[in-house]
Amino acid sequence: MNYFNTLNFTQKINQINKCRFMKKEEFNKKNDILKNKNIVIVGCGAQGLNQGLNMRDAGLNISYALKKNSIANKNQSWINAIENNFKVDDYDALIPDADLVINLTPDKQHHSVIKKLQKLMKKNAVLGYSHGFNIVEFGEKIRKDITVIMVAPKCPGTEVREEYKRGFGVPTLIAVHHENDINKIGLEVAKAWAFSTGGHRAGVLESSFIAEVKSDLMGEQTILCGMLQTASLLCYEKLITEKCNPAYSAKLIQNGWETITESLKHGGITLMMDRLSNSSKIRAYKLSKEIKKILSPLFQKHMDDIISGEFSNEMMKDWENQDLKLLNWRYKTKNTSFETAPVYNEKIPEQEYYDHGILMIAILKSGIELSFEKMIETGIKEESAYYESLHELPLIANTIARKKLYEMNKVISDTAEYGSYLFSESAYPILKEFISTLNKSDLGCALSHQSVNNIELYRINQKIQNHPIEIIGCTLRNYMKKMKAITVAK
């Protein structure tokens, strides 16, 4: 039973609204509450391994519990843990003595894993998640004596480790499941866990399981994964239709997302648009307005289906059906013309990605703003909406730069992958019709310089800079820069 749907209206609003930017003084106790405790991480994939490495470096006692057949077959999780000199054993051997059990297995495995863990966990132990799907959407019931918390780094596991090694961290969301906080220690343990992964150095949001799940699902389905996938396929097809070099076209898109979104990290949509000439900026702005208009109903449907639980219900049916839809979509994507395009070995200058990618920039702007706006309209706070619509975008774009959509879909969770395909199935025909009407200069070659109306340009600049995501983004990015400066100075 979907936990969110069991709440009354006021409870739903309070949970979705929960979001507080925590002060650095709140982490003065560091991770003292977890020192000399037995911490067992279940699963040793990207998040499991890299969070564990950080926590060990922070002075905590970390071991890994894996399934017996994973150990016997020496699978990748076992290799990850052993090669990094961690203690590894099965559930029966490690869970009964654990003070904190952190479940970092894939979403679809959570129910069966949690069922086993609950039978083995000692009284008053703490259970941790990094994504709340199992609690919120599946409605998992946890033993009342067990405290349930969440620490969710807002990036892939590899980035969690790399930022920690640089002496910094990644923005992190923490939460306590208030149905399971009988000893009132949840927040202190979550803070200590976030401190140990380095999250306190980049900024921590105190949120709720519900706010994390609903915003996370919306972001990954739309702008973070679904929009990038749809746009990659359609932009490549558009370039081929215009008789552009297939290898150049593929590289422009594959590396273009990463190059362009790098500007988002430093100055948001404003800086991304400022990288264009004035005439190109005006064109990108107008295209973005049109894209927002035609895609707004689809973004709204995804938000509505996430809030109602319809999305999760349909995806869990696919789990029961051996991932039939997911595997079919994965096969289709793997065999698209973009994924199988030839390699372009020449260098494309950085500015060329902007000058030849007006449409790509318009798609990014419209997708970020739509995703953010739909979350805000639903009651999700601006800080959460920013992290789930803009902040993670360069990290996802980086996966496409490595091995196109194959790499993105391999790195993201199965839940994100399913949602991405679902969005793309609907967005593809809508955007295809729109893109077919565009000018050649919108993608693949530079727009010739045109006369610019000063008043029009001024108004466009004002609208870009004054969008709510730019205002909250400026605040959050400045906070991260200050925290990084303090950390480096130490």
From Swiss-Prot:
Binding of substrate, residues: 413
User: Residue limits of the KARI C-terminal knotted domain?
Assistant: 208-343, 344-483
Q: Provide the residue positions that the database annotates as binding Mg(2+) 1.
A: 216, 220
This protein's cofactor list reads: Mg(2+)
Q: Which UniProt keywords are present, listed alphabetically?
A: Amino-acid biosynthesis, Branched-chain amino acid biosynthesis, Magnesium, Metal-binding, NADP, Oxidoreductase, Repeat
**Active site, UniProt feature:** 131
Q: Which residues form the KARI N-terminal Rossmann domain?
A: 16-207
User: Can you state which reaction this protein catalyses?
Assistant: (2R)-2,3-dihydroxy-3-methylbutanoate + NADP(+) = (2S)-2-acetolactate + NADPH + H(+); (2R,3R)-2,3-dihydroxy-3-methylpentanoate + NADP(+) = (S)-2-ethyl-2-hydroxy-3-oxobutanoate + NADPH + H(+)
Cofactor details (free text): Binds 2 magnesium ions per subunit.
Gene Ontology CC: cytosol
SUPFAM superfamilies for the chain: 6-phosphogluconate dehydrogenase C-terminal domain-like, NAD(P)-binding Rossmann-fold domains
> Which residues bind Mg(2+) 2 per the record?
216, 388, 392
Q: What does this protein do?
A: Involved in the biosynthesis of branched-chain amino acids (BCAA). Catalyzes an alkyl-migration followed by a ketol-acid reduction of (S)-2-acetolactate (S2AL) to yield (R)-2,3-dihydroxy-isovalerate. In the isomerase reaction, S2AL is rearranged via a Mg-dependent methyl migration to produce 3-hydroxy-3-methyl-2-ketobutyrate (HMKB). In the reductase reaction, this 2-ketoacid undergoes a metal-dependent reduction by NADPH to yield (R)-2,3-dihydroxy-isovalerate.
Family, per the entry?
A: Belongs to the ketol-acid reductoisomerase family.
User: What's the protein here called?
Assistant: Ketol-acid reductoisomerase (NADP(+))
Q: State the organism of origin.
A: Buchnera aphidicola subsp. Acyrthosiphon pisum (strain APS)
Read off the lineage from the record: Bacteria, Pseudomonadati, Pseudomonadota, Gammaproteobacteria, Enterobacterales
